[in-house]
């Protein structure tokens, strides 16, 4: 709800960066000192951490873009396909076994998403695909977590996610933070390309 309220006046990378800075501050002050200090950054799975971070960035940003254009209920309903995708991806990437009843449940769930998105009808809008993309990124995050969860701590994985968010948001700010690509009537596109502005006092609480 907070993200949706901010999507009409602020840039996506600005909103995400502020959230990231708050989360990183929390981790560095309240979590890292009690979990070995900066030793938590040591890892043998750096590439996997980067991939996980990019999956989260992909998932969050596409979902936030969906919130700018769709009713909250519709965006959340489509995003709920993520558990189904996790199951499918676990078969493909982790060789998990899924029984026929679970496959039937997946088919019913995917049919429900098709009913909501309504492809091929006049009611269809491209923004309906954004939460589906977000769900895909979220599902891949969980697959990668399964792969490294046995050797990497939760705090290490959390920190690398925030670092990835920070890098991506800063790069977005450098390349389009001046609003050079803004001016679209599409709310999702405008949220993505809007210029960085200083938050209004009454919006600071929502950012935090």
Predicted feature descriptions by range:
Residues 38-62, 126-132, 182-208:
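Loop-to-transmembrane-helix transition segments
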Residues 9-57, 137-141, 161-177:
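Transmembrane alpha-helices of multi-pass small-molecule transport proteins
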